[in-house]
């Protein structure tokens, strides 16, 4: 692995060769899932080209394995691209218990690009089991879209004025350097 220093932002590359005997059963759903996460998936010869605002990748189905090659503009985008691809692969093919190991550039822990800190602005009881909760925060425009059905909220421990938020590691996995916090999935009604 090529460890990059924090001040060494340059184009980065990495790849993963995943043993995947049942790839043919999962490839189409994996590609469809990737395409629903703000990435474009296009056939490119014997492979698929994935393009996102933060990088690009090639996915190639080989006999018994999936080869993923990524290229990004900097080290933070590298972990984000790994997460954006390994996440759907691991989720869609969860029963296969795939081992995804990356080689190439690494950049250390990187912040979650979509993480926003919000505060409760108001709470209104609608029924005994349903509440309307209004949140306030900065830079929330990315949530205001028709295809954004759910969001995950992370609850910092009560009284913790400086929580350590989750990060992305060199494998593109979400890690909790300060310990895992409670999370819930919510369905917003309006923004």
Placement of each model-derived feature along the sequence:
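Short beta-strand-to-loop capping motifs
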Residues: 16-22, 69-74, 137
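Short amphipathic
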Residues: 12-19, 115-123, 132-136
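Short coil-to-beta-strand transition motifs
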Residues: 107-117, 176-185
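C-terminal structural segments of small proteins and small subunits
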Residues: 79-94
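Long, contiguous binding/interaction regions
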Residues: 1-12, 26, 46, 52-64, ...
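Ferredoxin-reductase
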Residues: 123-191
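Short Lys/Arg-enriched alpha/beta "domain-start" segment
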Residues: 1-42
